[in-house]
Amino acid sequence: MTNRLYRESRGRGPDLVLLHGWGMNAAVWRGLPADLAIGHRLTAIELPGHGASPWDPATRGLDDWAQACLAAAPARACWIGWSLGGLVALAAAGLAPERLSG
């Protein structure tokens, strides 16, 4: 995959990566309590072909999506995924366990 994914970040502290579900985008995470961003840096990544993230026709499966998200994510973070985002987070953990802190 060659396209860069869209991401939104806010807050300071240990990194949390937020991955939305199928047919959604980063906006689903904007309703999280502001208090969470006080103690963490939240990075919501839009999956390939969702929201402002472009689709790459070379995408073949979850591992490709996970690689794209790893490229957009902070160096080490706790990943939180909703639905499809959870599957992508699990794939990322299998590909690069040293990049995920939880």
Regions found by a protein language model. Name each.
Residues 1-16, 34-41, 71-76:
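Alpha/beta-hydrolase fold catalytic core
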Residues 13, 21-24, 83:
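Active-site glycine-rich loops that stabilize anionic/oxyanionic intermediates
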Residues 18-21, 44:
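Structural cue for short, hydrophobic secondary-structure segments
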Residues 20, 40, 50:
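Histidine-centered active-site/metal-ligand motif
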Residues 22-33:
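The serine-hydrolase catalytic nucleophile loop
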Residues 24-25, 50-53, 87:
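Active-site loop signature of alpha/beta-hydrolase-fold enzymes
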Residues 31-34, 43-80, 94:
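Active-site loop/oxyanion-hole signature of alpha/beta-hydrolase fold enzymes
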Residues 76-102:
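Conserved hydrolase catalytic core segment
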